[in-house]
Design a protein with these regions (language model features):
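Short beta-strand/loop motif that positions the catalytic acidic residue
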Residues: 173-175, 179
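Short glycine-rich catalytic loops that host catalytic nucleophiles or stabilize transition states
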Residues: 34-36, 191-196, 202-203
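Catalytic histidine-centered segment of alpha/beta-hydrolase-like enzymes
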Residues: 42-43, 196-211
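Active-site catalytic motif of lipid deacylating hydrolases and related acyltransferases
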Residues: 2-59, 105-118
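Gly/Ala-rich beta-loop-alpha elbow adjacent to hydrolase catalytic centers
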Residues: 64-73
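Flexible "cap/lid" loop of the alpha/beta hydrolase fold
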Residues: 81-115
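Conserved alpha/beta-hydrolase catalytic His-Asp/Glu region
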Residues: 117-163
Length: 224
């Protein structure tokens, strides 16, 4: 049996370790993991997507992107012959971006984001108060390992300035009804995961492991 190649793209600042709990049947699928590259000076999202597409070495592959990685794989699709594009905890157009992000975009307040904080998560962890904050910072420390200042500033800007207004009807969208970054009320035409937050690639991995193969193979999916 010819196995289906599935390429996974993590979210903003995340490494492919966020997919460590994802398992697809080895009889049907081969899993490949993409990593963020440092953008070139003044590189557009389109140019970056074209460069990232070179890491996909199979025709008719499946692209799976999380959050900003979901935006990227939609742009990469322009340069590849793909079987499917699946986005998780992401958006299909800038119309699905919440109002607070649009305000940040219009005021250009994103240029004031202290990316140095993301570069020094270990320091934040030392001075954090409360077990919940420390637990979340430990998660960030483990999974958000891409902390290059050039990359962080570029990625935040590209996410906020994404100019797509028409959704690609072939893109399959999986979204949690408790997503705090991209609220479900703004999302159209998606497979809803009950209780899924923005990090459901970790917290809802059992649902994803059960249903992602079905989605790829066009089988019926459980939506609760």
């Amino acid at each position: 049996m010819i196995k289906i190649p599935v390429y996974f793209m993590p979210g903003l600042a995340a490494s492919s370790t966020i997919f460590e709990r994802i398992q697809l049947p080895v009889t049907h699928f081969e899993m490949y993991f993409l990593e963020w590259q440092i953008p070139k000076k003044s590189e557009t999202l389109t140019a970056y997507a074209k460069r990232m597409a070179e890491f996909v070495t199979h025709d008719n592959a499946v692209l799976v992107g999380v959050s900003f990685g979901g935006v990227l794989v939609q742009e990469m699709k322009k340069y590849l012959s793909v079987r499917k594009v699946i986005i998780i905890s992401s958006v299909k157009t800038n119309l699905e971006i919440p109002l607070r992000m649009k305000i940040v975009k219009s005021t250009k307040a994103y240029k004031l984001v202290p990316t140095t904080l993301l570069q020094n998560i270990e320091v934040l962890n030392k001075f954090s108060f409360g077990s919940m904050i420390q637990q979340r910072l430990k998660l960030y420390e483990k999974y958000l390992s891409v902390r290059d200042k050039t990359y962080l500033e570029w990625a935040i800007e590209q996410m906020l300035l994404w100019d797509r207004t028409d959704a690609d009807p072939t893109v399959i969208h999986i979204h949690g009804d408790a997503d705090e970054v991209f609220p479900i009320k703004n999302i159209q035409n998606c497979i809803v995961v009950k209780g899924g937050t923005h990090i459901m690639i970790l917290s809802k991995f059992r649902w994803i492991n059960e249903n992602l193969p079905k989605i790829i193979l066009n089988e019926t999916v459980k939506t609760t």
